[in-house]
Amino acid sequence: MLAEAAKIGYTIGEKYAKATNSGGRAMIHDIEPKHLYNEWKPNAVPKRSSAVVQFCGRNLLCRIDDNGLKLPSRAMFPDGDERFTYLFELDGREYYLLRDETPRGPGGWTYRDINIFRTEQPKEIAFAAVSAWHLCCWYRDTRFCGRCGTPLEHDVNERMMHCPRCGNMIFPRINPSVIVAVTHGDYLLLP
């Protein structure tokens, strides 16, 4: 019985690795040789070629075609730069969050649930989309001080919101996780 379960578990793991094109690596942050730079740039201004991430609920404005996942560029949004917040840089291309209460995208682009990005290609764009989602949620949920209720201000030196009244400082959360695989000999039981 245990040997049969081990075979099934190992087969499922192999199928997942093949389905995700991961070659055995199914981690979304495996984007080598690309590199994501998340240093805060307070004076960054989006270029026409900068990537734009815009969310409507849990859905991201994007396009998926035969060449994979694509994000719109700044050139597709005619309004002012004040609506854009710098997020990070991925191999020379800057990514900006478009803060818009009434999301509307350029023609040919649609909103897709963020859960699909786990298996989308190219992997580095999918990772950028998920990373942008985490920062989008942090900005959305970090508008008022948890101590005194005062509206927060963005710090000029680092990615931090601070309270001008009581001095409270709020940084993006890091949620560590542990990844476990249950094995029996050479078989993967629980991936």
Regions found by a protein language model. Give the residues of each.
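Short basic alpha-helical hairpin corresponding to helix-turn-helix/winged-helix-like nucleic-acid-binding
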Residues: 124-133
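Short cysteine-rich clusters marking metal-coordination/redox-active sites
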Residues: 145-148, 163
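Non-catalytic linker/capping segments at the edges of enzyme domains
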Residues: 146-147, 154, 178
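Short functional micro-motifs and their immediate structural scaffolds
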Residues: 150-153, 171
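N-terminal alpha-helical interaction blocks
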Residues: 13, 21-122
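Short, positively charged and aromatic/hydrophobic N-terminal segments
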Residues: 3, 7-11, 16-18, 37
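N-terminal strand-loop-strand
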Residues: 157-191
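Short, flexible, mixed-charge glycine/proline-rich loop motifs
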Residues: 132-140, 152-157
